[in-house]
Structures are given as structure tokens and as C-alpha cells.
Amino acid sequence: VGTTFYITLPFRVDPNPPKAESAKPEQAASIKGAHILLVEDNELNMEISQYILEGAGAIVAQAWNGQEAVRRFSESEPGTFDCILMDVMMPLMDGLEATRTIRAMQRPDAATIPIVAMTANTFSEDEQRSREAGMNLFLNKPVDSGKMLQTVLECLKMGGRNAL
């Protein structure tokens, strides 16, 4: 039933293909136990980012927009979160406004918690706006797992937490 096609492709299979780059085991283990507030309005991006972070041993709290991020941070005890990964473009309140709101809070960790801008906008002006809003680091989308884990490590060092 149907037609069968046979084709011959003129190439050889490499017996020693290059290994795909991934997070080094010691790198992944080094963020174990880190408490991260992940702020993302896109369900697939949230799922992928959470999978990467939890796979490396981090404890992830979710917020789906800037307003929820501000609420989650303000209702938490100071020092609860080691890092905030903040999408820049979201409904209700964008990541820049959420960051400015968090930075203006009267609590000891509001000015010091590392906040990472996550965005597909990679122009220098976008990075500058993120820094002006109070974000410390910049992570391009689509997210690369190794880069994400390295960025969280940088956050932990910035926040005074030693990597495990």
C-alpha cells in the first residue's frame, strides 16, 4: 500500500561526533539550594527555565508578571531569594517597572538582590534601559542552559552567597 522510495546520501557518519555543550556537573551542582524568583509570562519559557534551574538543584518560585513578582518579593522574608530572573516584556507590569518598584522598597535586600533581565531584545539600548532600571545582569532569549546557570552563579557571588 503506497510507494516506497530508496535514496542514497553521499556522506559519511562521523564515528566521533562532537559532544553537545551542556552545563558542567560541578557548575550545575554549585547552584544547588539557591532560591530563585523566576518571573516569566510565557508558559513555555517558564517551563524550560524552571526545568533548567531545578535540574541544577535550585529552588524556584514562579511569578507570571511584574505585579506578581513585586508581591512575591514584598511578602517574602528579607533574604528569602538569592536571585530574581526577570522577563522584561510582560503584561500588567513589565520587568523594568517591577525592578524599579523592588529597588525602591524599604527592606534590607531590595537594593542588593541580584536581578537578571531576560529578553529577546539584544540591542545595547535595551541592556542600558535594564541597567538604568536597576537590573544587574542581562540574559538573552532564547535561554541557553549553560549561560543561565553561569548567570545564576554570578548572582550568587554578587549576593554574597558562596557557590556550593
Language-model regions: role of each:
Residues 1-164:
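C-terminal compact regulatory domains
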